């Protein structure tokens, strides 16, 4: 995404860089300052004590209960349909550019991006609320030197794309 952003300057690329680095810091950073190798694929759900992808999947009734604004557009944007369910649940992923969402809602791209951010905030809050019935997967505490070295390279690329975000300092801290 860093190289793509340097070539094309699409906001989606910059957002993806920022969100990915934030996720790494929040979920994968170890007390040592290095980054963990992996998360367990399985986590408990209300239906199963060990379900692959359980923390990251949503039932349609859970999504409906969130009372998200523009729910039909939400379902379209994240490809929630009877054909996209995985074992009866949904893995939310963007299937359309923000421009298409703006056109669908008949609003400008900034307002569409605001809608997307609101949906993400509601989903994050709902994830926090269901943490007892669907806890986060366990993090493997192992830190691999080679993978942390790749992260240094990735952070350096992110710094070239977005030099004011401090990614260079993060990369140097791993050296």
Question: Can you name each region flagged by the protein language model?
Answer:
Residues 1-174:
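Aromatic (Trp/Tyr) and acidic
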């Amino acid at each position: 995404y860093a190289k793509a952003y340097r070539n094309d300057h699409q906001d989606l690329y910059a957002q993806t860089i920022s969100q990915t680095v934030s996720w790494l810091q929040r979920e994968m950073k170890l007390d040592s300052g290095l980054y963990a190798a992996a998360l367990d694929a399985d986590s408990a759900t209300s239906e199963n004590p060990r379900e692959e992808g359980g923390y990251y999947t949503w039932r349609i009734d859970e999504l409906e209960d969130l009372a998200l604004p523009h729910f039909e557009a939400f379902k379209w944007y994240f490809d929630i349909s009877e054909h996209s369910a995985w074992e009866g649940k949904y893995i939310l992923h963007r299937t359309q550019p923000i421009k298409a969402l703006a056109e669908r809602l008949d609003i400008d791209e900034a307002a569409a991006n605001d809608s997307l951010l609101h949906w993400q905030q509601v989903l994050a809050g709902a994830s926090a609320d269901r943490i007892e019935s669907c806890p986060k997967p366990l993090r493997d505490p192992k830190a691999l030197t080679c993978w942390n070295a790749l992260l240094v390279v990735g952070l350096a690329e992110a710094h070239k794309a977005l030099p004011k975000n401090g990614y260079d300092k993060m990369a140097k801290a791993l050296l």
